[in-house]
Swiss-Prot record:
GO biological process terms on file: cell differentiation; spermatogenesis
UniProt keyword terms in alphabetical order: Coiled coil, Cytoplasm, Developmental protein, Differentiation, Spermatogenesis
Principal location: cytoplasm
Subunit details: Interacts with TSNAX.
PANTHER family in the cross-refs: TRANSLIN-ASSOCIATED FACTOR X-INTERACTING PROTEIN 1
UniProt protein name: Translin-associated factor X-interacting protein 1
Record keyword Ion transport present: no
Keyword field contains Transmembrane helix: no
Subcellular location: Cytoplasm, Perinuclear region
Record organism: Homo sapiens (Human)
Protein function: Possible role in spermatogenesis.
InterPro entries to which the protein is assigned, alphabetical: TSNAXIP1_N
């Protein structure tokens, strides 16, 4: 490609030079006409044709390949651009800077794509969690719908029963009203008969009196005036009595006997009460039915919404990975992968796979690039250049970290943990190999998050956790083993389940019954176990060659972390402020004393010193006015307290009953 260079289009006709002219002007039209009259006749140079043929051939070869990518398709263009740079010496600096700018941009885009890979994995995890939640919600919804259907059927049966009772009561009321009307007519007939009999009786009495007067005139003959007056008065009394009787008939003709009225009134009152009760029951059942129908409709609406969301997620989300594909890739084959994947969810399987990939990459690396001497670089990693990879086994790293912890605990003059770590490596391997071992150990503990010894050492080394947390946890485990040994009177390494339970409750008096039950299950207790069953308690504190503890000790650590989170959450709730708001030293101290009244002054000062990053000697005394000036964001204070060994000292005082 480096043959003779043609000067084209340097000496072509002047018409090839582009001029900035207004497109619609007269001058523009004249120039266009002139250009049409004198067309270009300059031929394409040989160098340009060779470059085009070369580019066409390379692109054709790439198109024939099955695995060509956009990165490979750029390679012919990059080579042609390099030919330009080499052949055109005058423009070489400018063309080189252009090439470097584009290469830098491509490298930046590659790094950006690589940085987005974890986000893709996170999206996969979120999708899996959403699928699980949707399945759980659908199962719960199905169960609730079945319960609502059963309850609806029961309510419908109850409504039918109440309707039947209502109909029967209505028929009974109708029958009673009919009987009442019949009785009324009967008594009305009797009243009329009595009136007729009374009239007949009066008529007979008058006739008898008249006959008596006619048969014995001598008796009354002595005083006829008197008799006439008496008869007149009697007839007046009769007339008055007859008028009163007529008034009484008019006023009380429709009146029934009080006894019958009271009996019918009582019956009517009872029926009315029953009717009111049935109406109230019916109204209550109707309202419950309406509420259930509303719940049913809202449930159907939520179901449709969740179903549409599920379809949208299934359409847009990444499918669930098939983890069985890893068994043929991971070192050790299907048996080792089955052992690694047992009892783990997708998120944990990702960590396992990353550890396997990371360990494989570590074994392939012979050197690590130095991180430099920046202030953000830990002191034990400050080095410029290549650092040898010592390639120790996982077991060797764990044993080395255990030795470091032993020496740290035996150290009298405490220095910072990173400085101690580097001094330990210098003393162990010499100054020449200390940096290589520091990089090697750091890369290993950064990868193996599932290993207890490595993950805890990494957290302490990077300042994410105080070393007192590790020390306190070891002391707790040692104290628990001592208590179990004291309870083992025969020194056989065996305890009954009852003794095991007693030791746990005496060692951890603040743990709930549920937490004690979890520890017993982690130790080997089953619901079918009896109090007399024996337990080999020493096996609970064993460790494998890689430093992994038994499930019992792991459960102790999990409960410790959960208790710490719950303790800090109670503190946040007691303070009653948001995470982004500021909290003063007196308020934080008061919140701690409220949720944990058994705290002593020294412990509280230690917590305050950590939360506000003040030496205990510089902290203001309790009640001092300077306390209000010490403030910190609540979230920052809680994160600092999360680092140290903070736990409940005594039970929280119960709130007074109202």
């Amino acid at each position: 490609m480096g043959g003779h260079l043609s000067p084209w289009p340097t000496y072509t006709s002047g018409q090839t030079i582009l001029q900035n002219r207004k497109p619609c002007s007269d001058d523009y039209r004249k120039r266009v006409g002139s250009c049409q009259q004198h067309p270009f006749r300059t031929a394409k140079p040989q160098y340009l044709e060779e470059l085009e043929n070369y580019l066409r051939k390379e692109l054709l070869l790439l198109d024939l390949g099955t695995d060509s990518t956009q990165e490979l398709r750029l390679q012919p263009y990059r080579e042609i651009f390099e030919f330009f740079i080499e052949d055109f010496k005058t423009y070489k600096p400018l063309l080189s800077s252009i090439k470097n700018a584009y290469e830098g941009m491509l490298a930046h885009q590659r790094e950006k794509i690589r940085a987005l890979e974890p986000l893709k994995a996170k999206l996969v995890t979120v999708n899996e969690d959403c699928n699980e939640r949707i399945l759980a919600m659908r199962a719960e919804e199905k169960y609730e719908i079945s319960l609502l259907k059963k309850e609806k059927m029961n309510l419908l049966k109850l409504i039918d029963k109440k309707n039947e009772e209502k109909i029967s009561l209505q028929s009974e009321v109708t029958k009673l009203r009919k009987n009442l009307a019949e009785e009324y007519l009967h008594y009305l007939s009797e009243r009329d008969a009595c009136k007729i009999l009374i009239a007949d009786l009066n008529e007979l009495r008058y006739q008898r009196e008249d006959m008596s007067l006619a048969q014995s005139p001598g008796i009354w003959g002595e005083d006829p005036v008197k008799l006439t007056l008496a008869l007149k008065m009697t007839r007046q009394d009769l007339t008055r009595t007859q008028m009163e009787l007529n008034n009484m008939k008019a006023n009380f003709g429709d009146v029934v006997p009080r006894r019958d009225f009271e009996m019918q009134e009582k019956t009517n009152k009872d029926l009315q009460e029953q009717l009111d009760t049935l109406r109230a029951s019916y109204e209550e059942v109707r309202k419950e039915h309406e509420i259930l129908m509303q719940l049913h409709m809202s449930t159907l609406k939520e179901r449709d919404q969740f179903f549409s969301e599920l379809q949208e997620i299934q359409r847009t989300s990444t499918p669930r990975p098939d983890w069985t594909k890893c068994k043929d890739v991971v070192a050790g084959g299907p048996e080792r992968w089955q052992m690694l994947a047992e009892g783990k969810n997708s998120d944990q399987l990702v960590d396992v796979l990353l550890e396997e990939i990371g360990s494989g990459l570590l074994r392939e690396k012979d050197f690590f690039p130095g991180l430099g001497y920046g202030e953000a670089i830990p002191a034990f990693l400050r080095f410029d250049g290549l650092v040898e990879n010592k390639k120790p086994s996982k077991k060797d790293v764990v044993n080395l970290l255990k030795d470091a912890w032993k020496e740290r605990l035996a150290e009298e003059q405490k220095e910072t943990f990173p400085d101690f770590f580097f001094n330990f490596l210098e003393h162990r391997f010499g100054p020449s190999d200390a940096m290589a071992w520091a990089y090697t150990i750091f890369e290993n503990i950064k990868i193996f998050h599932s290993n207890e010894v490595m993950s805890q050492f990494y957290a302490v080394l990077m300042g994410k956790r105080s070393e007192n947390v590790y020390v306190t946890q070891k002391e707790t485990v040692a104290q628990l083993l001592k208590e179990m040994t004291n309870a083992d009177s025969q020194n056989e390494g065996l305890l009954t389940m009852e003794q095991f339970n007693t030791v746990l409750k005496s060692t951890f008096p603040l743990k709930t019954e549920e937490q004690i039950q979890e520890l017993m299950e982690a130790g080997g207790w089953h619901p079918s176990s009896s109090n007399a069953d024996l337990l080999n308690y020493r096996s609970l504190f064993m460790e494998d060659e890689e430093g992994q503890s038994e499930p019992f000790v792991q459960k102790l650590w999990e409960q410790y972390m959960d208790e710490k989170d719950e303790y800090l959450q109670q503190l946040k709730q007691e303070l009653g402020i948001e995470l982004h708001e500021e909290v003063t030293l007196p308020k934080l101290r008061g919140g701690l004393m409220t949720i944990d009244p058994s705290l002593d002054k020294q412990t509280v000062n230690t917590y305050m010193s950590q939360a506000f990053q003040l030496p205990e000697s510089e902290m203001p005394e309790e009640g001092d006015e300077k306390e209000e000036a010490v403030v910190e964001i609540l979230q920052t204070a809680l994160e600092r307290l999360q680092v140290i060994d903070i736990r409940r000292v005594g039970p929280r005082e119960p709130e007074p009953a109202s």
